[in-house]
């Protein structure tokens, strides 16, 4: 006798619907499950509307459409419900993924099951797929390898079905480690509203630069999620003492620890030092779920604050590949809420976030411990048609005096 689990799902157009599910235990040992076919997203029919986002010659208006182009840095592989019967699949990554499983979760059924299995998803891919549950009755694989059979469902209201992604791909494993939940997008509000006396304060970006920016922010988010960064951030006073010892000085140069936005009396070494609890809170401001608008400047200064963080074209094209993250770290700190009075933004007073993050970032490149370390995955530096400057292939070198190299001596890779 078939074991049926029935429950009610909310719908936009229907009052309720009873759904039947049967699991392995009700089928017997001889049941042979027939799962949905796997999908190669590099070879999709036109009905799936496959495309590559951020093609070099794509109109910039598309990347500036914040209703269509956005992602959270810890979820570069994005699955969004479209209407009551379809999903939009997008990958915000310069490198594709293999062996990707998209799981679904229904109300009142506590197990996730595989609704799509992609053998390949190419870089910056987007396509659309019908939710198989609306097509008819199917077998689905549960996380534990067992099978559940679900009857046809006519459609789903927003939020009635939840999607999540898993993959055995080593790149995806790095994505999963990212703690930051920043919502990343591009905004044209800055360059379209330049002041009359500074017409190049902000410059428009294009898909070539957007791809570099996306690559950089994923790497940056990984770096500030890294155990070495967290340990150094939480124990910044120890880091400063280690710097002094390495330099052979008896006293720490500048502030002894993190301090906030209040005006300081550096001459008398008076700072508004943060407590341990406040330092933990400060760390969370770097990784919370606020919106980040990435932009580009053309004037004498980069800018950050509120949702904005920006830098010059060179930072996007070559700088981040070489680990030159000082400007970006500074503006990202303004975006996270810190002023020039705080060493969380300011590089002065013996060094602060700008200096420490840059050293750490370079050490992670040295360890090959970022999601992306090869500038040739994009070759943005070669695409002179879309750039204002002329660039050579970025070549990374590490300073033998890098404090993380001195301390960890090639160890500390995230395992």
Regions of interest found by a model, annotated:
Residues 1-9:
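Bacterial N-terminal signal peptides that target proteins for export
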Residues 9-12, 30:
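Short, intrinsically disordered, low-complexity terminal segments
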Residues 16-20:
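C-terminal motif of bacterial Sec signal peptides marking the signal peptidase cleavage site
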Residues 22-25:
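Bacterial signal peptide processing site
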Residues 28-324, 335-415:
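Predominantly extracellular/secreted Zn2+-dependent metalloproteases
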Residues 331:
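Walker B catalytic acidic pair
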């Amino acid at each position: 006798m078939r074991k049926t689990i029935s429950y009610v799902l909310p719908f936009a157009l229907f009052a309720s619907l009873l759904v039947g599910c049967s699991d392995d235990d009700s089928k017997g040992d001889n049941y042979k499950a027939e799962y949905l076919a796997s999908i190669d997203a590099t070879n999709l029919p036109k009905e799936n509307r496959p495309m590559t986002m951020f093609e070099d010659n794509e109109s910039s208006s598309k990347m500036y459409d914040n209703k269509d182009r956005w992602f959270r840095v810890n979820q570069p592989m994005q699955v969004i419900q479209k209407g009551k019967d379809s999903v939009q699949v997008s990958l915000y990554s310069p490198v594709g993924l293999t062996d990707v499983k998209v799981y679904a979760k229904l109300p009142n059924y506590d197990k996730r099951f595989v609704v799509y299995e992609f053998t390949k998803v190419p870089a910056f891919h987007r396509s659309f797929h019908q939710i198989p549950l609306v097509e008819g009755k199917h077998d689905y694989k549960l996380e534990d390898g067992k099978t559940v059979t679900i009857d046809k469902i006519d459609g789903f209201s927003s939020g009635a079905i939840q999607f999540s992604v898993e993959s055995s791909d080593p790149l995806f494993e790095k994505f999963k480690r990212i703690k930051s939940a920043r919502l990343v997008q591009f905004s044209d509000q800055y360059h379209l509203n330049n002041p009359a006396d500074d017409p190049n304060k902000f410059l428009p970006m294009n898909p070539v630069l957007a791809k570099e920016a996306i690559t950089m922010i994923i790497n940056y988010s990984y770096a500030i999620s890294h155990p070495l960064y967290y340990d150094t951030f939480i124990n910044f006073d120890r880091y400063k003492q280690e710097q002094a010892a390495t330099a052979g000085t008896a006293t720490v140069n500048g502030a002894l620890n993190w301090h906030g936005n209040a005006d300081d009396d550096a001459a008398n070494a008076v700072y508004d030092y943060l407590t341990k609890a406040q330092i933990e809170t400060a760390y969370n401001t770097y990784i919370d779920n606020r919106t980040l608008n990435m932009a580009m400047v053309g004037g004498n200064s980069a800018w950050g604050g509120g949702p904005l963080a920006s830098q010059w074209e060179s930072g996007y094209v070559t700088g981040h590949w070489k680990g030159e993250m000082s400007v970006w770290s500074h503006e990202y700190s303004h975006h996270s809420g810190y002023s020039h009075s705080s060493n969380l933004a300011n590089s002065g007073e013996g060094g602060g976030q700008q200096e420490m993050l840059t050293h750490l970032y370079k050490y992670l490149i040295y360890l090959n411990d970022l999601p992306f370390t090869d500038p040739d995955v994009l070759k943005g530096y070669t695409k002179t048609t879309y750039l204002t400057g002329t660039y050579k292939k970025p070549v990374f070198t590490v300073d033998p005096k890098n404090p993380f190299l001195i301390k960890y001596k090639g160890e500390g890779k995230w395992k």
